Regions:
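Conserved acetyl-CoA-binding loop-helix of GNAT-fold acetyltransferases
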Residues: 97-111
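Charge-rich, low-complexity intrinsically disordered segments
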Residues: 145-165
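Conserved acyl-donor/pantetheine-binding loop and adjacent beta-alpha core of acyl/acetyltransferases
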Residues: 55-88, 96
Length: 165
């Protein structure tokens, strides 16, 4: 099974997307393009032919030094740590269990490595919405924040080891 990933455009038809979680559906259908046009975030769609089978959204952010896991703090100054934030990731119900989520995550990680070549980034972060999501990210060696176990991070050096340079 192959799919392609494209940055969200006005002409993409996303209205029929359904991942089973209304807030994610609503974001993609009503707010993703608006957020992208305001440069608040960037959304990428996964397609099987012309069907949207999943999406993810990236934004830059940071984490306070005190809220970061020890591995993120090590070797850095006591300032906020720059991050790429995976703001959203969703897979259409009909495509669940077919590794689309893993493919989307790996694409997001690869784009993060590219962004790190032009701006400072130390890690990639996500706020898992539930235990199932947390377990998904932990399979990719994400580590939890000491202040919130649902805030998960992976260092760029670990991303390189996971997906290559």
């Amino acid at each position: 099974m192959t799919f392609r990933i494209e940055k969200l455009r006005r002409d993409h038809r996303v209205e029929g997307f359904d991942c089973g979680k209304e807030p994610l559906n609503r974001f993609l259908i009503r707010f993703a393009l608006q957020s992208q046009l305001s440069n608040s975030s960037q959304t990428y769609l996964a397609f099987s032919q012309d069907e949207v089978v999943g999406f993810y959204t990236l934004a830059f952010g940071d984490v306070n030094y005190e809220d970061a896991p020890e591995r993120l703090r090590k070797g850095g100054a006591r300032h906020p740590i720059p991050l790429m934030v995976l703001a959203r990731l969703a897979v259409a119900r009909a495509w669940a269990g077919k590794w689309i989520g893993s493919g989307l995550l790996k694409d997001a990680l690869a784009r993060t490595l590219a962004a790190a070549e032009i701006a400072g980034l130390r890690a990639f972060a996500v706020h898992a919405k539930d235990d199932e999501a947390r377990a998904f990210y932990e399979r990719f060696d994400f580590i939890a924040s000491p202040s919130d176990p649902m805030h998960l991070f992976v260092l760029l050096k670990d991303i390189r080891a996971l997906i290559g340079p």
